[in-house]
């Protein structure tokens, strides 16, 4: 019996895979629990269309990430912070501050996607790595200046 998996099943296959199983396993376990559907002609067409739409959506997300990375690459960002006599800032520059500064420039980036190479606790130039997509990462150079 052929079934189409609705989710990943260890040892059997991944979501939307067409797999051959014994009739008892398919009818008594996989289908009643919602792990799979019977592989009819119409179900195969629906799954093929879903896969096509998912691929199109993933491609669009990647294109958007590339466009955003091009905007960020040529950007000069300044972050204002209170600085003491020794040049150290009070506290540290956070990903939220970087995200807010990018938003003021018209670029929306989730703060969770911004990572620093160490703590940013002094004035001067620094870099942050922004993970826009699993295949698109961009390095942002920013300057911390005294308020």
From Swiss-Prot:
GO CC term, one of those recorded: ribosome
Superkingdom as given in the UniProt entry: Bacteria
Record's signal peptide: none
InterPro entries the record matches: Ribosomal_bL9, Ribosomal_bL9/RNase_H1_N, Ribosomal_bL9_bac/chp, Ribosomal_bL9_C, Ribosomal_bL9_C_sf, Ribosomal_bL9_N, Ribosomal_bL9_N_sf
GO terms of molecular function: rRNA binding; structural constituent of ribosome
Protein's job: Binds to the 23S rRNA.
Name of the molecule in the record: Large ribosomal subunit protein bL9
The organism of origin for this protein: Cytophaga hutchinsonii (strain ATCC 33406 / DSM 1761 / CIP 103989 / NBRC 15051 / NCIMB 9469 / D465)
Gene that produces this protein: rplI
